[in-house]
């Protein structure tokens, strides 16, 4: 499945499950080295509820973001922006 097919499928699923605006929860696993956690957090506005927790060995940080999203397109755009950060796993 190509990236575009994946995002089209995700859009369909999001529209089936959510009505907008909605509080959407993003979850990411981010390598703790460097400023990658900061880069992920910086992609969301100050109104977002962001929590993070480092793994027991400190190699990774889980980042959870709860934020009001206005459309499935806006959610997909955030996923695409985060995907540009090397090593981030999107759950």
Residues covered by each model-derived region:
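Long, contiguous binding/interaction regions
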Residues: 1-62, 68-91
């Amino acid at each position: 499945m190509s990236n575009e097919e994946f995002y089209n499928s995700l859009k369909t699923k999001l529209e089936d499950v959510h009505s907008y605006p909605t509080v959407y929860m993003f979850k990411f696993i981010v390598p703790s080295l460097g400023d990658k956690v900061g880069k992920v957090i910086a992609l969301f506005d100050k109104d977002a509820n962001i929590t993070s927790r480092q793994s027991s060995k400190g190699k990774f940080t889980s980042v959870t973001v709860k934020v009001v999203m206005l459309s499935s397109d806006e959610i997909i755009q955030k996923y695409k922006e985060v995907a540009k950060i090397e090593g981030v796993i999107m759950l």
